[in-house]
């Protein structure tokens, strides 16, 4: 079979170009197109089902800072903190009352989080441990009144002494009572000051309080948020434009917030954190709106990572330095006065939650060093306190994540309330939480065998084609160099077969003829077959040696 050198050159070149274009251009576009059609929130799709009812729980850890010297702190001493935790909960997320808008390509829903205590994972903790924390009603209430309604201080002080008789600045209570079951609030007094104080409970301004009967309430940090409405979202479905998948369009039926001084900080940026668009670029970051902070936060790319053998991207985030970053000045009380900005690594939540609370990373990680120095018992480090997300960009899948946040009291002395008049001014850590997920192989295999298997097959195919094309190009170059018109494959195979046949059929060499016409004795040849030395075929063995006399 004759292979013309021109055809071999053209065929090999075409194969090389095809491998490049198909492997690095066409196949990725086909794959992205297929993913974009599958990853949407269209009713009936698999992604919609997983998104609306997460089939597995997230882990939710709570770490509490127990104040070991409460009486001393009440007199102005430096707080000594003891971290207690984690108290482990299974967090189930679901979305209900879903309403689709086909024209706008959006879906509206109400988010619901359900926390179930996991006693096995919490061991040796049981939830019945007694914790000492700043009084969750007296301290925030007294500080807020002093800052915003100082004229009412005397009335509030008297009301607190009636509703919470003999109360101190720090409250000792069981963990489950503080966080879920609730501590008792007695509004049965007929005193005007007590009734005035309890008005905020009856009107629902204290969102953490649950009314038990006509005169009593139960206050807890998270009890009211458990298995209840946590906000109405409207997000893009991604059917018309896959890049907008999950993007928050409205929250609480409003297109933007009305909380911060500047409009830009009131905008919704990113998703609801439960879904992300596929095909993101690593420099785009991962943005999500967090209702607990009334703010959108963006995670930025840190480095490459892997999860169950699959490549991913590690993202992280922090609260930044609001004072130093001009874009964040709208989170200051007065954007024109930088002295009203919170310290580095913190965020003032007063406008969001209506109390003197500050958010930060756990143990003030990446925050102002003074925050750590103001209290004893903190040890900030990246491993335990940083936020991270291992994310697969092409499919938009978060393989594992840990969202960590600490809540602190912006504490100060209050002259009008006896138990609070000597408190030191500092930001006091109360507790921090971690919400995380690690996908098991049931779900990672969906990505592995639909995405990465296709990528691997494409990789093998394109490199195989490139290898074959390069071999063909080298043969073509050889033919052009030797000015041969074609590559005779049959001839090459035939010559190779002849060499093999000769090697297998050669017989041993016969002994040399002892009779010579010369007195010169020939060198004895070995009986091995060396090309050109066989006596039967070598013409030198038939030459006669002529004797010449010397002169």
UniProtKB/Swiss-Prot annotation:
Q: Which cysteines are joined by disulfide bonds?
A: 265-330, 294-352, 332-341
Question: TM segments?
Answer: 8-28, 460-480
Ranges annotated as biased composition (Polar residues): 514-540
* Keyword check for Cell membrane: yes
Q: How does it sit in the membrane?
A: Multi-pass membrane protein
- What are the protein's UniProt keywords? Cell membrane, Disulfide bond, Glycoprotein, Membrane, Olfaction, Receptor, Sensory transduction, Transmembrane, Transmembrane helix
Provide the primary localization.
membrane
Q: Give one GO term, molecular function aspect.
A: scavenger receptor activity
Where in this protein does the record put region Disordered? 501-551
Per the record, the GO terms for biological process are: cell surface receptor signaling pathway; cellular response to pheromone; detection of chemical stimulus involved in sensory perception of smell; lipid homeostasis; pupariation
The organism's place on the tree of life at top rank = Eukaryota
Membrane-side (Cytoplasmic) residue stretches: 1-7, 481-551
- Topology feature Extracellular, residues: 29-459
- Subcellular location(s) of the protein: Cell membrane
Question: What positions does the record give for glycosylation?
Answer: 66, 213, 226, 440
Cross-referenced InterPro entries: CD36/SCARB1/SNMP1, CD36_fam
Q: Which GO terms describe its cellular component?
A: cilium; cytoplasm; dendrite; neuronal cell body; plasma membrane
| UniProt record similarity statement | Belongs to the CD36 family.
Q: Explain the purpose of this protein.
A: Plays an olfactory role that is not restricted to pheromone sensitivity.
What name appears for this protein in its UniProt entry? Sensory neuron membrane protein 1
Organism listed in the record: Drosophila simulans (Fruit fly)
Gene designation: Snmp1
